[in-house]
């Protein structure tokens, strides 16, 4: 029975960045700190998509694979889809495994545009592309950062099962009200 199950507590930081995007220290240092200094159980790197080059995406996937140890320290490969609010706003995208396609909101700060055909310029395009490629194991949540997510404009409950209500950016009760007004089921 679920009621008889012991409640387990896990500590994690799912949204951090490194010097390759807008943070400090390398991505390697970020995961090393999360595991060996902060003693987290789970961690994810959410670099802004328009700053993640093909080279860094490959490197980031290699780092998450290296640090992921089942039942010890879980890493979640992913990125921050960083569309402007009028296009759906920030979404954190997490994959259950490495080497997935990064679908950027733009290549604004990336010179190499050889994979620009994978860009999704709106949150709805992101959800449609995940559906088209049968990536229903992808987890997306609406993020209230610099370009706050507009879940009234774009939402797909098959991927976006949660919204960010509180972070170091502040508390965002309005996003819960938006979800209820739209009849969304969120956790």
Locations of the language-model features?
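Extended, charged catalytic domains and RNA/DNA-binding interfaces, predominantly
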Residues: 1-187
């Amino acid at each position: 029975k679920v009621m008889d199950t012991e409640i387990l507590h896990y500590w994690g930081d799912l949204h951090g960045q490194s010097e390759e995007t807008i943070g400090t220290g390398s991505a390697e240092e970020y995961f090393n700190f999360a595991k060996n200094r902060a003693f987290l159980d789970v961690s994810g790197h959410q670099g802004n998509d328009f700053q993640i080059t093909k080279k860094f995406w490959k490197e980031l996937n290699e780092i998450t694979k290296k640090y992921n140890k089942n039942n010890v320290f879980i890493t979640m490969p992913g990125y921050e889809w960083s569309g402007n609010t009028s296009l759906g706003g920030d979404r954190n995208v997490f994959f259950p495994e490495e080497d997935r396609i990064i679908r950027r909101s733009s290549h604004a700060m990336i010179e190499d545009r050889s994979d620009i055909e994978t860009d999704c310029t709106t949150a709805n395009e992101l959800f449609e592309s995940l559906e088209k490629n049968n990536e229903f194991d992808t987890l997306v949540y609406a993020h209230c950062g610099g370009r706050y997510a507009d879940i009234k404009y774009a939402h797909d409950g098959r991927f976006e099962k949660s919204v960010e209500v509180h972070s170091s950016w502040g508390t965002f009760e309005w996003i819960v009200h938006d979800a209820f007004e739209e009849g969304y089921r969120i956790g």
